[in-house]
Amino acid sequence: MMHTRQLFQCFIVMVFGWATFAHAEPKLLEPEQAFQVKVRQRHNDNVTAHFTIADNYYLYRDRMRIAVKDTPGVVIQSVHFPAGIMKQDPNFGRMEIYKNAVAVNIVLKRPAGTQKVTLVIDYQGCEEKTGVCYPPMQKALMLTLKD
């Protein structure tokens, strides 16, 4: 009788332990870990915003915006987003996304002598396995330009 009770208790522990393990969701990264962005000057007025995207995460191309902030006379002439991957998104329908990394090229127009520029970058992304999407994020990055 005692042996049967112990077997039954072990069975219950195994069933509930397995159920908890099977339903455990992966831990989500903080947004700053999932989506890292840096800017650097490539040449004269050409700047690159480089995104490093964690494994199993992606960024929406259409949710990316780049603007100049608090830098008089400096404007963005053009922004070039490379081609991404098309994804059927459960929340937004057919969307272009980036995985792993993406480099966005930015051409500035600035007066002579302008040394510092602040770029404000808006973006949004999701974790692929759970389908959890982060709220839109914004990052302001200052860059010292060389002539």
Features from the language model and the residues they span:
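Bacterial N-terminal signal peptides
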Residues: 9-18
